[in-house]
């Protein structure tokens, strides 16, 4: 099975940034021009990107919606978007401007009925559940809060109501370039019967991508490793082909 590799664009203050372990005070601007960054990916032959509205995650609204819609309109890239999704109207609006998949994060923990309603209205192909965990416990509200629910139990509960795709982020590894938490992915994949998993957090090299392919993951999100020059766009395409 081939693994899709999604370069990430995290948006804050209209710029493409990277955070360290999700800490907003430790942000690095990687490209002040978000559209230009998306074009770089497009020109390199990337087909899908992972876009996070960081203000949205903090404020619970689609703060960068217009910019994200513009990325879609100008590049035609497939886009999966997350950050601040709190209503069916927001999801509908994103899908209406051509966004391919919408990630529901905090609401999956706080309001499973919302996920059910989203699945019913938009279908499991458009809805992704983002599970962000700190030491195995699910983090919410832009990672500022940690719940007492572990990542496996949330994934199983979501799979039961019809979720078929997860993005799993190990917050402790995100933006650290220390390697992915392979054990967590193994446990998650072994627990799920129908759903697929996209990995995020800690990926530091093309070797990591090869190792993750062996696990049977549906995809992997590459952020800091690309922006810091450790993984090239050529290596990303090669890993997808291989």
UniProtKB/Swiss-Prot annotation:
GO BP terms in the entry: L-histidine biosynthetic process; L-tryptophan biosynthetic process
Compartments in which it is found: Cytoplasm
Record's keyword terms, sorted: Amino-acid biosynthesis, Cytoplasm, Histidine biosynthesis, Isomerase
Catalytic residues, chain numbering: 10, 132
GO molecular function: 1-(5-phosphoribosyl)-5-[(5-phosphoribosylamino)methylideneamino]imidazole-4-carboxamide isomerase activity
Highest taxon, organism lineage: Bacteria
Gene3D superfamilies per UniProt: Aldolase class I (3.20.20.70)
Listed EC numbers: 5.3.1.16
One cellular component term from this protein's GO annotations in UniProt: cytoplasm
Keyword DNA-binding attributed: no
A Pfam family annotated for this UniProt entry: His_biosynth
Reaction(s) this enzyme catalyzes, per UniProt: 1-(5-phospho-beta-D-ribosyl)-5-[(5-phospho-beta-D-ribosylamino)methylideneamino]imidazole-4-carboxamide = 5-[(5-phospho-1-deoxy-D-ribulos-1-ylimino)methylamino]-1-(5-phospho-beta-D-ribosyl)imidazole-4-carboxamide
Pathway: Amino-acid biosynthesis; L-histidine biosynthesis; L-histidine from 5-phospho-alpha-D-ribose 1-diphosphate: step 4/9
Family: Belongs to the HisA/HisF family.
NCBIfam families recorded: 1-(5-phosphoribosyl)-5-[(5-phosphoribosylamino)methylideneamino]imidazole-4-carboxamide isomerase (TIGR00007)
Name by which UniProt lists this protein: 1-(5-phosphoribosyl)-5-[(5-phosphoribosylamino)methylideneamino] imidazole-4-carboxamide isomerase
Provenance organism: Streptococcus sanguinis (strain SK36)
